[in-house]
Amino acid sequence: SINATDVKTNDAVTIKLTMDCFRSNGVTSGMVSLGGNVQTIGTKPDGSLWKVAIQNPTAEEDADFLGILETKDCAVITSGGYERYFEENGVRYHHIMDPATGKPAESDLTSVTIVSENGTLADGLSTALFVMGLDKAIAYWQAHASEFDAVLCTEDETLYVTEGIQDAFSANYPCEIIQQKGAES
């Protein structure tokens, strides 16, 4: 049997294999986008940074997005319960499972975007931080800030952006910068 988690993992693996093929064949500029998974190599051919829009999980139209991230040489991977779900008796059940309960995760986050040079890490963390919820996700980033950055979106469309990408991210909604532990406010 195949479930949504298997498909998502296959998206990340497909992108990794594609990027490995590009690199082994000398490609120095490119972008692959598959679902909520985006991976870039280098900059655009003109030398400018790639622009990756992060979808608004509560938007009724696809054209609405949380913001734009300018980037190069990294993965930008988003998880949220807004695309793969079903409704029964007025209750929405999404595909991101809480391993502690075996049920859809109850989270105060509507989406988690991870930015990392390691696409496999970003794929796993986008789901894990969604399950953790805002406070634990922030604490996790603060303990592992050298490995990834993040854009966390709450139900009220407040964005929490890690300081490592604050200058590269143009937000369309209220935004708070998450700083590393011990950093001055």
Say what each PLM segment does.
Residues 1-185:
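Mature catalytic core of soluble alpha/beta enzymes
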